[in-house]
UniProtKB/Swiss-Prot annotation:
Binding site for beta-D-glucose 2: 358, 361, 708-709
Residues where beta-D-glucose 1 binds: 176, 278-279, 349
Taxonomic source organism: Ignavibacterium album (strain DSM 19864 / JCM 16511 / NBRC 101810 / Mat9-16)
InterPro entries to which the protein is assigned, alphabetical: Class_I_gatase-like, GLMA-like_second, Gly_Hdrlase_35_cat, Glycoside_Hdrlase_35, Glycoside_hydrolase_SF
Transmembrane regions: none
Location, primary (coarse class): cytoplasm
Pfam families noted in UniProt: GLMA_2nd, Glyco_hydro_35
GO molecular function annotations of the record: hydrolase activity, hydrolyzing O-glycosyl compounds; metal ion binding
PANTHER family hit by this protein: BETA-GALACTOSIDASE RELATED
Annotated thermal dependence: Optimum temperature is 55 degrees Celsius. Stable up to 60 degrees Celsius after incubation for 1 hour.
Any one annotated GO CC term: cytoplasm
Reaction catalysed by this enzyme: a D-glucoside + [(1->2)-beta-D-glucosyl](n) = a beta-D-glucosyl-(1->2)-D-glucoside + [(1->2)-beta-D-glucosyl](n-1)
Protein name listed in UniProt: Beta-1,2-glucosyltransferase
Length: 716
């Protein structure tokens, strides 16, 4: 199995292939039932099984390895691999070193953690160990033991890979790199990390004079420079943290490179993958930030396909936009790879969270509509932790397709239904596309926040007002972009694509009727120039809530302002504005950009009747600027987005009589699939027509059960 880059899907035996896998943890299941679980998985239409290979489970004590079940029958990894082959199932293996998976010590051997010196662990700014199971990724000690583990497990994987007629087709490198840093907001200040950081800074700036000019500091030499810590008080602190974020993206790339080179040295030629976390408390607004942390890996390792951890916990209208948004952002970041879900929720990790089969089935179909090209049901089979190995307790996952004893649960039939649809339609469905006339810009520097904002502890090191700013980048990307614009476009049934603004060209941008940018007060010169050229060459740009006048280090950079010939001031006003005749539009900040431009058309006003939004012809294109921030909390916000979209005569593909119904049309030159999605807990009955055929007869009535779906296939 390999990815088909030109159309971004997997290929198996020369044919388009939708990757359907199920997570089955051999070490959490009675070995007598292994075959039952595999057979029942295959009977759903899946052709792949996925599992971690816990280092702790197989290296019981230092140099005491067991892969054949000599000390415990569930350690017989080789037998499990052979069973996969016998059942004609491909196998995805995840040998760590980290596995997480609610396994004690995240899968690292307890003997190892006791033996490692303090300098092998991630340390806080005071030199204290952050957590007893959190090592410093590039610690020489840790890598030495990791390689010893690889020396034992990789020959087994190599022997059983596909080219040697084994079942193994894919391997995951480590697991959710950087996730602890995101959750805790604590950086690794291990001495080796700090030395690498200083090397990074020297390579980036070359001379201390160059750094001083950017930071507005007066260091005598690079020896005076320290890694940033604590709260941001000065602009120089902000600059240092910005570079610290850049450094850690390179640091993760270095770690992955070391692991990959070691793995390839064993003659392992299968596809490699890594998983991206980010769903938390039923929302995925943080997942794009975590995608950004892997940007250097994606740039330097095109042979690693990144997969999303799509774990919504409970699916609802409130988070229904999240899978599409994350799919689109990942596609923008690795445009030559299929979008797939390395962990695709099947069941629930926490007993108090209920994940019902009907809801998940609708989520699975919605993900197909939203362009997913493969997924791994996580967990397909429930597990029972070996004694002392469960992080939270004995049972691992609830409401799965199979319980640990291989009994079918309610989700099994839903998975089988979805899989059968995929297998029947995959050759056509994988070759379909969605017609998108709207493009949304993804600007990675707005996502550099994991080191200054704790997800779990809710600690913030950045107060933008202390730097003379008013737009917090985290609020911008979460509430204005992700939960605002992207949710609004999907709710209104407008298709959109996402583009990486730092890795695109003018030609690709001008192919769209509109480009939307949610912007802070800062943006680098190159991107400001790109947006200027986009408009001058005929593009339609919608920019809000601010025209950037600073670069990413908060130095003056007014390229957009000057090239567009606009003048404005920033001042406080009421939280409500009027725009396009829509009254009482609630804005997130009291501060607004107030425009003074006689050559533009006013489109939005404060309650003091000052102009806070304009449209202006520039070159061959048109600029629309809103100097206020809005998300999606009211119907006025949806109406405003709708008005902006219609400025350039963009239409929905269908007219649907019930606006609560979301729909997606995927098509190629042979087939059209119409997905109708009811994210509401009430039955919906409606008619639909193509937007180009509004005068023609309406369709027959369609009725969809509460929180369900309907797929209609039309042959052209």
């Amino acid at each position: 199995m390999k990815p088909h880059n030109s159309e971004k899907y997997f290929v198996k035996n020369g044919q388009p292939h939708f990757l359907i896998s199920g997570e089955v943890h051999y070490f959490r299941i009675n070995p007598k039932l292994w075959r039952n679980h595999l057979q029942l998985l295959k009977q759903t239409g899946a052709d792949t099984v996925s599992t971690y290979i816990p280092w702790d489970w197989h290296e019981i004590e230092e140099d005491d390895f067991d892969f054949e079940g000599k000390t415990h029958p569930a350690r017989n990894l080789i037998r499990f691999i052979k069973l996969c082959k016998e059942e004609n199932l491909d196998l995805i293996v995840k040998p760590g070193p980290y596995i997480l998976a609610e396994y004690e010590n995240q899968g690292l051997p307890s003997w190892l953690l006791k033996k490692l010196s303090k300098n092998a662990f991630a340390l806080d700014e005071n030199g204290n160990v952050i957590s007893p199971d959190l090592v410093s990724y590039l610690s020489d000690e840790f890598l030495e033991y990791t390689f010893k583990w690889y020396d034992k497990v990789m020959p087994i994987i190599s022997k059983h890979q596909k080219e040697h007629y084994g079942p193994i087709t894919m391997m995951q490198l480590c697991n959710e790199i950087g996730v602890f840093q995101w959750l805790s907001g604590k950086s690794d200040y291990n001495p080796k990390v700090i030395n690498l950081y200083k090397e990074f800074i020297i390579q980036r700036y070359k001379t201390i004079e160059k750094l001083n000019s950017v930071y507005s500091t007066n260091y005598n030499s690079f020896d005076d420079l320290k890694a940033p810590s604590g709260k941001i008080k000065l602009r120089s602190d902000y600059c240092a943290y910005f570079d610290f974020h850049l450094f850690f993206r390179e640091y993760y790339n270095k770690y992955i490179s070391i692991l990959k080179n070691k793995i390839r040295s064993f003659g392992i030629n299968i596809k490699l993958t890594h998983n991206i976390p980010g769903w938390i408390y039923g929302n995925a607004s943080e997942l794009p930030m975590l995608i950004s942390t892997y940007s250097e890996i994606m740039k330097n390792h095109p042979d690693i396909i990144f997969g999303l951890d799509h774990i919504p916990e409970f699916v609802s209208f409130r988070n229904a936009h999240s899978d599409l948004a994350c799919n689109k952002i990942l596609e923008a970041m690795q445009p030559e790879a299929p979008v797939w879900a390395a962990e695709f929720q099947a069941g629930t990790r926490e007993h108090h969270v209920k994940a019902y089969a009907k809801d998940l089935e609708t989520f699975y179909i919605a993900s197909l509509a939203h362009g997913i090209k493969g997924f791994n049901y996580y967990m397909f089979s429930q597990g029972i932790n070996p004694e002392g190995k469960g992080f939270y307790g004995k049972t691992f996952y609830f409401q799965t397709a199979l319980d640990a004893a291989s009994n079918k649960l309610a989700l099994y039939d839903s998975i089988k239904k979805v899989n059968r649809f995929i297998r029947k339609e995959q050759k056509d469905l994988l070759r379909t596309n969605v017609n998108s006339e709207i493009c949304v810009g993804f600007y990675k520097p707005y996502f550099f926040t994991e080191l200054i904002s704790s997800q779990l502890l809710k600690e913030k090191k950045l107060n933008v007002e202390e730097l003379g700013l008013y737009i917090d980048p985290r609020f911008l990307r979460e509430e204005i972009l992700f939960n605002g614009l992207l949710r609004g476009l999907q709710t209104l049934n407008y298709n959109y694509d996402v583009v990486d603004l730092e890795n695109c060209d003018l030609k690709s941008l001008t192919a769209y009727k509109q480009l939307w940018i949610t912007s802070a007060e800062f943006m680098d010169a190159e991107t400001q120039n790109l947006l200027s050229e986009f408009v001058l060459n005929g593009g339609n740009l919608i920019l809000y809530p601010a025209v950037p006048t600073l670069d990413n280090y908060l130095n003056r950079c007014e390229i957009l302002k000057n090239n567009f010939g606009i003048e404005f001031i920033t001042k406080d006003s009421s939280h409500k504005v009027s725009a396009f005749g829509i009254e009482d539009v609630f804005t997130a900040f009291s501060k607004k950009q107030i425009y003074n431009d006689t050559n533009s058309k006013p489109i939005a006003f404060t309650q003091e009747n000052e102009i806070c939004g304009i449209r202006k012809k520039i070159g061959k294109g048109e600029l629309t600027i809103l100097g206020f921030a809005f998300g999606y909390t009211s119907d006025e916000h949806l109406e405003l987005i709708d008005k902006l979209v219609k400025l350039n005569k963009i239409k929905r593909e269908l007219f649907v009589s019930d606006k609560d119904i979301q729909f997606v049309v995927r098509e190629n030159n042979k087939s059209r699939y119409i997905f109708f999605l009811n994210y509401h807990n009430e039955r919906k009955t409606f008619n639909y027509r193509k937007s180009s055929e509004l005068k023609k007869k309406k369709s027959e009535e369609i009725s969809i059960a509460p929180f369900s779906y309907k797929v209609i296939k039309e042959n052209k």
